[in-house]
Every structure is written in structure tokens, then in C-alpha cells.
């Protein structure tokens, strides 16, 4: 490559698509710098192999960025606190990473004086949108180059291109595209394109020789796990430890079908044991400490947050507002959750919190309470029926009378009360003798 060639920073994973991009971009006249952004899920040997792959296919220089903590701080923490599961099953394992990868690639690109940035996304998935939106927002001055998308390259074509030039084809190249990261692993391709086809047995079946069932205890502070079995452990380190433990049981494996940012349907297989355990445990702890409407509105906004993140719209200012609400809602989400792990499944079997609103000293569901009397409960239940009674009256004209018990006014006289349903049917306002006395007094 001539020294005057313009510099380009390529988001590089070491997989087939980005491996193809290196020599293809070099042939097009670019001095290609590969940038591997570690978002979790890779081992030192994995990173060594990625570095060798980049050099063997012609990278001028290879850069590595450890972004695991940034992924956790910027994205994963809100996915936990928001209990975000797309389609009620999938914890957004990939969406949390792509924007951070774009952020890191732009930082490297500016550091090396690059004129362009590139990625290996196809034209049919979500990643192209996530990368392009982030790159345009972060670095509008940089050209975006996408060989796979622009040339419509398929996997078999990329393999043939590399083989013809005597360049190494990634060892795992084949029918599947695999993404491993802090928040889980996904598989795309092959069987995932046929909605009737099942996955390989190893994807959904528990390991052949899992350990016996066991329990763990997670300690929580402000809606985030901060301890594992009484020992301080948080962030990426806790997720990694929990993910390894879940994998021994085969916990967290499933299939997700959803709508892409482009409006088409997509199907993936995934394994995200740590994500599912943390979200499940966090949700149960929240039930102790949040009011019904706190949980309701937080969940509605968190669902929107997940949708926007999934579709590459992380930089929409509304997401900063939602993050502020989520953070505020977690002030009292502290305590412990007890989780039972077994082959292929987990259960949250216990929760406790110093801020629990489940207080046996004042009330026990279905048994007794000290906050109200039986007469007060009867009155509450009667008033609670009003909207449905009114709706029935409006829909049916004259709804059938419902059996009702008598109620007493404060003087204890049943003769001074009138049936609420009779008043609803006649359209009259209920008026007791006591109320009449008050009206007369005002006269």
C-alpha cells in the first residue's frame, strides 16, 4: 500500500465479513486500520487470533479497545434496571454493543487521522442501522464505507474471495453468524431462517452432565447487583461469573422472533444466562419496594427505551430522559434475592429488602390486617364496583339487580341507607337521612 493512501478505520471482529473487508478495501486504495472493540465474551486467545487474522489479511495496524465497562455503564445497567426483554424473552444482547463499538471506532479513527470508517454489516439486518446512525451522529465528517452491503456479498462469495487470494478464512466461517458479548451470545443463519426448523440440539438442551441444583444469593444496591453469595462483585465481573455458572446448567438458551429496524421479521437463537437471571431477580425485588404505578410507568418507558436502542436510536434525547426516570425509580431497590439454579432453568425463590412494603406487622394477604376494619373493607369493595355498574347500566339499559348487603351509616341505622344499585338504575344520587339533615341545616 502506497504511503499516500487515505486512512480508514474498520470495525473488525475477526469474522468472515470483516475479514473480507480488509483486502477488499485495500484493493480499493485504502490504508486499513482494524479496530477490535472488546465488549465482553472474548478470551485472551480469542483476541490473539483476531489480531493475527487482521495482520494476515493485510491490516496496516490493528487496534484493540477494552470497552466492557463502558458497555455496562452506558447500556447494560439500564437494561437491568428497566427489566428490558424484547418480545418478553430476548435481552438485547447485540444492540447494547453496537453503539459502543461505533463510539470506540470513531475515537480511534480520529486518533489516527482517518478519512473514513467502515463496518461489515449486510443490507438486511439491524447492525447497519445501528452503526450508520451512530457514526453519522458522532462523526458526520467521516465517510462511511460498507463493502458487504454495497456489493451485496454473500457468505459463500466472501469465502471464495479469500480462498482465491490465498488468504486465511476464519475457522468458524460457515452457515452461522455468531456474536459473543457481555450481555449474551446470538446465532443467526442456517436454521434461523426457517421458522419451523428447530435449532441444533446443543443450543436448547442442557449439558449432558450438569452439576446438581444449587442456590446463589445476589445482593442489590440501587437496582444493580453488587454482591454474589455475600462477596462484593459487580458490573462486567459479576456478569462474567454468573454467565459461566449459568452455562454449566444450560440456563438462558432460547429463540427470538422480532421485527427489525427495517420492518422485516428476523429470527435468532441466543444464550444469555446472566442477563436473564439478573433481570428476573431484579424484577422480583422491585415488586417488594415499588408502588404499582411506579412499576407500571417505569416498565412502559423501559419497553420504549429497549425498542429505540434495538433500532439504533440510542442518541434520541428522549432516552436520556427515560434513563433519569429509571435511575430515580431505583433509589430504594436494595436487598437480596435467592435464586435456585437447575439444568435448563432458574427460579427466584426468595427476596428481602429493608425497604419492603410487604409488612406482616400491619397486614397479611388473605388472612388479617390492622389498617382497616371489615366494614371499611366492605365499603371499599362496594365503591370499587361503581365503574362496572355504570358501564353495565349504560350498555344494557336496565341491568339486573345484583345481590347486595346492607350498610350502616355512622349512627348504625340500616333504615337510613339505600341500595347503590337502585340509585344507579334510576339515575338518582344516593341521599341518606343524615345527608338530608345536613342539607336542611344549610338552608
PLM feature spans:
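Nucleotide-activated chemistry modules centered on ATP-dependent adenylation/adenylyltransferase
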Residues: 2-400
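Short, low-complexity, charge-dense intrinsically disordered segments
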Residues: 396-414, 418, 423-425, 429-443
Amino acid at each position: 500500500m502506497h504511503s499516500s493512501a487515505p486512512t480508514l478505520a474498520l470495525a473488525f471482529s475477526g469474522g468472515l465479513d470483516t475479514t473480507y473487508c480488509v483486502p477488499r478495501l485495500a484493493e480499493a486504495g485504502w490504508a486499513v486500520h482494524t479496530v477490535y472493540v472488546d465488549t465482553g465474551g472474548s478470551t485472551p486467545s480469542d483476541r490473539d487470533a483476531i489480531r493475527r487474522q487482521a495482520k494476515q489479511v493485510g491490516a496496516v495496524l490493528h487496534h484493540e479497545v477494552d470497552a466492557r465497562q463502558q458497555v455496562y455503564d452506558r447500556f447494560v445497567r439500564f437494561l437491568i434496571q428497566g427489566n428490558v426483554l424484547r418480545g418478553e424473552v430476548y435481552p438485547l444482547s447485540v444492540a447494547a454493543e453496537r453503539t459502543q463499538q461505533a463510539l470506540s471506532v470513531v475515537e480511534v479513527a480520529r486518533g489516527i487521522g482517518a478519512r473514513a470508517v467502515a463496518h461489515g454489516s449486510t443490507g438486511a439486518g439491524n447492525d447497519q442501522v445501528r452503526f450508520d446512525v451512530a457514526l453519522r451522529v458522532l462523526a458526520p465528517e467521516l465517510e462511511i464505507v460498507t463493502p458487504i452491503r454495497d456489493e451485496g456479498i454473500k457468505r459463500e462469495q466472501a469465502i471464495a474471495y479469500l480462498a482465491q487470494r490465498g488468504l486465511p478464512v476464519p475457522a468458524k466461517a460457515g452457515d452461522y453468524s455468531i456474536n459473543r458479548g457481555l450481555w449474551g451470545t446470538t446465532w443467526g443463519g442456517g436454521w434461523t431462517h426457517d421458522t419451523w426448523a428447530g435449532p441444533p440440539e446443543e443450543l436448547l438442551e442442557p449439558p449432558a452432565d450438569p452439576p446438581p441444583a444449587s442456590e446463589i444469593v445476589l445482593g442489590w444496591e440501587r437496582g444493580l447487583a453488587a454482591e454474589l453469595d455475600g462477596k462484593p462483585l459487580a458490573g462486567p465481573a459479576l456478569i462474567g461469573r454468573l454467565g459461566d455458572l449459568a452455562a454449566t446448567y444450560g440456563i438462558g438458551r432460547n429463540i427470538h422472533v422480532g421485527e427489525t429496524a427495517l420492518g422485516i421479521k428476523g429470527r435468532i437463537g441466543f444464550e444469555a444466562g446472566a442477563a436473564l437471571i439478573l433481570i428476573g431477580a431484579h424484577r422480583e425485588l422491585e415488586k417488594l419496594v415499588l408502588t404499582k404505578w411506579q412499576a407500571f410507568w417505569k416498565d412502559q418507558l423501559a419497553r420504549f427505551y429497549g425498542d429505540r436502542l434495538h433500532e439504533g436510536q440510542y442518541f434520541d434525547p428522549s432516552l436520556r430522559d427515560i434513563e433519569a426516570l429509571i435511575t430515580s425509580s431505583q433509589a430504594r431497590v436494595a436487598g437480596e434475592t435467592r435464586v435456585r439454579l437447575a439444568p435448563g432453568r432458574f427460579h427466584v425463590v426468595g427476596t428481602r429488602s429493608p425497604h419492603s412494603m410487604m409488612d406482616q406487622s400491619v397486614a397479611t394477604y388473605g388472612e388479617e390486617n390492622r389498617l382497616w376494619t371489615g366494614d371499611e373493607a366492605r365499603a371499599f369493595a362496594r365503591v370499587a364496583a361503581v365503574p362496572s355498574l355504570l358501564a353495565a347500566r349504560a350498555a344494557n339499559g336496565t341491568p339486573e339487580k345484583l345481590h347486595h348487603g346492607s350498610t350502616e351509616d355512622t349512627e348504625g341505622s340500616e333504615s337510613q341507607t339505600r341500595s347503590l344499585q337502585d340509585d344507579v338504575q334510576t339515575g338518582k344520587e344516593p341521599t341518606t337521612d343524615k345527608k338530608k339533615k345536613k342539607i336542611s341545616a344549610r338552608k
